[in-house]
């Protein structure tokens, strides 16, 4: 698993998924570092590493379905669904008022155990919102897992990488000024 995490960090840095500047995160917080997992997940090899890493972390967990919130979690949840042969549900950020008018694509059945997938966790509010929606459907949350945990939530979420891992790796491959 360590080799996979190292390879994932390296590739995310290579494709420019670790950005430095002044950013406003979805939580509203400001940050000097932005982890663009959405960009990273457009590369098939990275998406495969993510799904392999998550599948390895979840292999001993009993669950029935994978859930995510649009947009960032979708490619990750789809890849994990294919890898683990589990159905998935995608929660919309907002209920649509046209077509089927639903707040989700797919279903959650009463009594199911569901894994919630996220791209990046900052405060955890998006993941916890998805978890609430799972529970409101009569199912239970088996786990919440993210590609990157920014380590700002005060909670111990399951993740493949911590923000500090990415920054440390980035700093170790940057030339130092004399």
Curated annotation (Swiss-Prot):
Q: Sorted alphabetically, which keywords does the UniProt record give?
A: Glycosyltransferase, Magnesium, Pyrimidine biosynthesis, Transferase
Q: Where does orotate bind?
A: 122, 150
Q: Which cysteines are joined by disulfide bonds?
A: none
Matching Pfam families: Pribosyltran
UniProt pathway: Pyrimidine metabolism; UMP biosynthesis via de novo pathway; UMP from orotate: step 1/2
Q: Please, one GO biological process term? A: pyrimidine nucleobase biosynthetic process
Q: Which InterPro entries match?
A: OPRT, Or_phspho_trans_dom, PRibTrfase_dom, PRTase-like
Instruction: Name the enzyme's class.
Output: transferase
**What's the EC number here?**
2.4.2.10
Q: Where does 5-phospho-alpha-D-ribose 1-diphosphate bind?
A: 92-93, 96, 118-126
The protein's required cofactor(s) are namely: Mg(2+)
Gene Ontology MF annotations:
magnesium ion binding; orotate phosphoribosyltransferase activity
Free-text function comment from the UniProt entry: Catalyzes the transfer of a ribosyl phosphate group from 5-phosphoribose 1-diphosphate to orotate, leading to the formation of orotidine monophosphate (OMP).
Give the UniProt family note: Belongs to the purine/pyrimidine phosphoribosyltransferase family. PyrE subfamily.
**What NCBIfam families would the database entry show?**
pyrE
Q: How is the subunit organization of this protein annotated in UniProt?
A: Homodimer.
Under the heading HAMAP family, the entry gives: PyrE (MF_01208)
Which PANTHER family does its entry note?
A: OROTATE PHOSPHORIBOSYLTRANSFERASE (PTHR19278), URIDINE 5'-MONOPHOSPHATE SYNTHASE (PTHR19278:SF9)
Question: What's the protein name?
Answer: Orotate phosphoribosyltransferase
**Gene name tied to this protein:** pyrE
């Amino acid at each position: 698993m360590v080799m996979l995490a190292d390879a994932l960090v390296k590739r995310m840095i290579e494709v420019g998924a670790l950005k430095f500047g002044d950013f406003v995160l979805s939580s509203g917080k400001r940050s000097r570092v932005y982890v663009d997992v959405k960009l990273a997940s457009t590369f098939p090899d990275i998406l495969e590493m993510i799904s392999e890493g998550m599948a390895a972390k979840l292999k001993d967990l009993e669950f029935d379905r994978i859930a995510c919130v649009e947009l960032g979690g979708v490619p990750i949840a789809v890849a994990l669904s294919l890898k683990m042969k589990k159905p998935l549900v995608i929660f919309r950020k907002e209920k649509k008022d046209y077509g089927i008018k639903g707040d989700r694509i797919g279903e959650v059945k009463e009594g199911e155990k569901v894994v919630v997938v996220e791209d990046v966790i900052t405060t955890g509010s998006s993941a916890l919102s998805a978890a609430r929606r799972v529970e409101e459907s009569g199912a239970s949350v088996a786990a919440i897992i993210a590609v990157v945990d920014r380590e700002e939530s005060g909670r111990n979420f399951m993740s493949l990488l911590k923000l500090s891992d990415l920054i440390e790796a980035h700093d170790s491959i940057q030339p130092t000024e004399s």
